[in-house]
Curated annotation (Swiss-Prot):
Cofactor needs: Mn(2+)
Family listed: Belongs to the FBPase class 2 family.
Lineage: Bacteria, Bacillati, Cyanobacteriota, Cyanophyceae, Synechococcales
Descriptive protein name: D-fructose 1,6-bisphosphatase class 2/sedoheptulose 1,7-bisphosphatase
Domain of life per record: Bacteria
Binding sites annotated in the UniProt record for Mn(2+) 1: 33, 57
Function comment: Catalyzes the hydrolysis of fructose 1,6-bisphosphate (Fru 1,6-P2) and sedoheptulose 1,7-bisphosphate (Sed 1,7-P2) to fructose 6-phosphate and sedoheptulose 7-phosphate, respectively.
NCBIfam families per the UniProt record, alphabetical: glpX
Listed GO biological process terms: fructose 1,6-bisphosphate metabolic process; gluconeogenesis; glycerol metabolic process; reductive pentose-phosphate cycle
Binding site for substrate: 100-102, 131, 176-178, 198-200
Amino acid sequence: MDSTLGLEIIEVVEQAAIASAKWMGKGEKNTADQVAVEAMRERMNKIHMRGRIVIGEGERDDAPMLYIGEEVGICTREDAKSFCNPDELVEIDIAVDPCEGTNLVAYGQNGSMAVLAISEKGGLFAAPDFYMKKLAAPPAAKGHVDIDKSATENLKILSDCLNRSIEELVVVVMDRPRHKELIQEIRNAGARVRLISDGDVSAAISCAFSGTNIHALMGIGAAPEGVISAAAMRCLGGHFQGQLIYDPEVVKTGLIGESREGNLERLASMGIKNPDQVYNCEELACGETVLFAACGITPGTLMEGVRFFHGGVRTQSLVISSQSSTARFVDTVHMKESPKVIQLH
């Protein structure tokens, strides 16, 4: 993939974040999502690529979405043959969440961001809109903790890997009734729990950075966001495992289908032969090159949110690549009026 693509996808998430941030605190989560989708689609369609959405968003709550299978990029146009050389063109798979944490935006809460991951065709796992059991941990614990182990066992391993006492560890868990026993087990083991209402992509990624005071993500969340988290952790060298949840009784909702049997049939129709398989980040994001980008909508652990000022907007983004050992935080001032105004603080 072209090295300039990293800069292009930063602009994609920036535009989505800016559009969504205008609806921060207005209680309109679907509108905040809709404008982010439209802004993301518009910017992606200006990139010299043939992209295909393999992880979309919005299916669970019938919100607007960049639908699975949608093609984006200049080279998907009908007249593309005149300016896109097929011999030089790389087909790209894209996983998106234009507004990760729609409720967070709607109610003015921290932790929402616009995110996407890209790889060459076939490089990202096309996860169904199911739930996924997840385990994320820092690079030092990669291959040592395991999703099949209990939370208590993993905390002991994590303590050894990080050279910290269990009491110093902080585990992020989504605040859901299904996690009642998990939360109690973590607390009984001596670790601390940080409950979040939404936005587990940010929590997963934060495990890979020192100084965030987040040492693990545990529990069940959405599978599509699991693939995006895995792409980021693949780039960062962190630990991520995911296992699809196909039994509605596990999460006590009907959001993943009416029956266990029906869900198993759906997975089989998608070519998933072992529904109980545990995937690591190299399997969920298996491409030779994986790029991840995010832009804060509201303030979060890693990035500031969008800040509006007279004459412009300021954003903070993150871009990482599996091909390099760098995580670039990009602070951008978008000047909107003349004379140009740059606000530094």
